[in-house]
Structures are given as structure tokens and as C-alpha cells.
């Protein structure tokens, strides 16, 4: 009888296993993962990957010291996510896709795209992602190739759709690659070029957003159309 009692109790435990307590939510409504990612971006921007520590990141985030390993698998995995978020701060894939798939003309889509880029450039000093990329330009990390595949290529493909509609260039042609570079690189340069230096050297690029937009639009449309004519 005693054996039957313990056997029955064991079977009940198997069919009704104890429930894990639910993880408490943060009072501010933000997920712990997002808070750690934000704190990490700021720490990496200040110190670089080599000097940053998981301990400091967790302290900044106000989380358990094991949060980096729990959510990202370690500092390396966290930095990979930080690079993706840094690129998203400049232009998210969702925003770009919304522009490309709109009912607007290709010329108007390019205008909206450039307006977004200029707005980002005007607020670049507030974005830790910009400092991350300045560090990467000075000393590229081994995480860049994966970041390019994960974050840059999907946006590049979307941008090519817009360029194709303006130029008529084949999507995989060398001319399309060059055209994409001639659109993307000036945008990146505008965002990454420190605002204080732009104000000193080229003040018209720092204060007159509307004038800059019209000039960039005319410059890029003229160039892209010329490339399309040359390829025909």
C-alpha cells in the first residue's frame, strides 16, 4: 500500500509539473532585453568593444549581472545586436520598405528617403549608433561581415528597387552596384560627418535642411537618370 501511494503521487507530479513563477515585468514597461541593448550601445560607443565589460553594461541597465549572457549569449552576441540597432537608428528596414512600397512616384520616393536621411543627420549627435560606426570606420571589428549580411544587404536590396525604377538598370548589373554606392555613400557621409565640423566647414549643409534636400534630390536624380541613359 505504501508503495502504491508513492507511485500514485509520482505519477501525479509528472502529469501536473510545478509551474515556473512568471518573470516580473519592469515597472516602466520596457523589456529587460531592450534596456540591456540600449545600455550596451552607450557603453560600446564610449569605450569600444575591447574596453567595454558586461558588468558595466548590466550596471548601467540596472539588471542582473547575468543578463548579457542570458539574452545575448555573451558580449560578442550583444555587440552584433548593437551594430544592427545602430544601423536601424539611421534608417530602419521597416521605414525603408514603407517608402519603397508606397504609391508615390520614384522621384517622390527618393525625396522622402533623402528627407529621412537629412533629418537623421541633423539629429546625429543624439544617436549613440553614430559613434559606434565612427569607431568601426577607424578600426573595423570582426563582427562587421555578419552585420553587413544581416542588416545592410536587405536595405541595399530595397534601395536597388528604387534605383531600378529611376534608371531602368538591371538589378544585378555592375552599373546598378555603382549607382547604389553613389546614392548610399553620400547619405552615410552626411550622417557620419560630425555636425560641428559641417557647421564650421560647410554651414549651408548644417542649418538649411530644405535647401540641402532640394540640392541632393536634384544631384541624385540628375546622376541616376544620366546613368540610365548611358546604359541604354
Please place each PLM-identified region on the residue numbering:
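N-terminal intrinsically disordered/low-complexity leader segments
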Residues: 1-31, 42, 230-232
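Generic hydrophobic, amphipathic alpha-helix propensity
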Residues: 32-41, 57, 82-90, 159
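Helix-turn-helix
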Residues: 35, 43-77, 81
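Short secondary-structure transition hinges
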Residues: 90-97, 101, 118-157, 204-210
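Hydrophobic alpha-helical connector segments
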Residues: 95-127, 173-183
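Short alpha-helical scaffolding segments that buttress acidic/His motifs in well-ordered protein cores
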Residues: 117, 130-137, 180-187, 216, ...
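Hydrophobic/aromatic-rich alpha-helical bundle segments in the mid-to-C-terminal region
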Residues: 145-153, 162-217, 227-232
Amino acid at each position: 500500500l505504501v508503495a502504491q501511494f508513492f507511485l500514485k503521487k509520482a505519477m501525479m507530479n509528472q502529469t501536473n509539473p510545478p509551474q515556473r513563477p512568471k518573470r516580473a515585468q519592469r515597472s516602466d514597461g520596457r523589456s529587460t532585453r531592450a534596456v540591456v541593448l540600449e545600455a550596451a550601445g552607450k557603453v560600446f560607443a564610449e569605450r569600444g568593444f575591447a574596453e567595454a565589460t558586461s558588468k558595466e553594461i548590466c550596471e548601467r541597465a540596472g539588471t542582473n549581472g547575468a543578463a548579457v549572457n542570458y539574452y545575448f549569449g555573451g558580449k560578442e552576441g550583444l555587440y552584433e545586436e548593437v551594430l544592427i540597432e545602430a544601423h536601424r537608428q539611421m534608417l530602419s528596414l521597416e521605414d525603408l520598405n514603407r517608402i519603397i512600397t508606397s504609391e508615390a512616384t520614384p522621384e517622390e520616393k527618393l525625396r522622402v528617403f533623402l528627407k529621412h536621411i537629412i533629418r537623421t543627420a541633423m539629429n546625429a549627435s543624439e544617436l549613440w549608433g553614430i559613434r559606434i560606426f565612427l569607431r568601426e570606420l577607424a578600426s573595423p571589428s570582426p563582427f562587421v561581415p555578419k552585420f553587413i549580411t544581416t542588416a545592410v544587404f536587405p536595405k541595399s536590396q530595397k534601395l536597388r528597387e528604387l534605383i531600378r525604377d529611376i534608371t531602368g538598370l538591371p538589378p544585378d548589373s555592375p552599373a546598378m552596384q555603382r549607382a547604389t554606392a553613389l546614392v548610399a555613400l553620400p547619405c552615410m557621409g552626411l550622417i557620419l560627418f560630425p555636425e560641428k565640423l559641417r557647421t564650421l566647414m560647410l554651414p549651408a549643409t548644417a542649418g538649411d535642411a530644405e535647401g540641402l534636400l532640394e540640392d541632393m534630390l536634384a544631384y541624385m536624380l540628375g546622376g541616376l537618370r544620366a546613368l540610365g541613359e548611358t546604359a541604354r
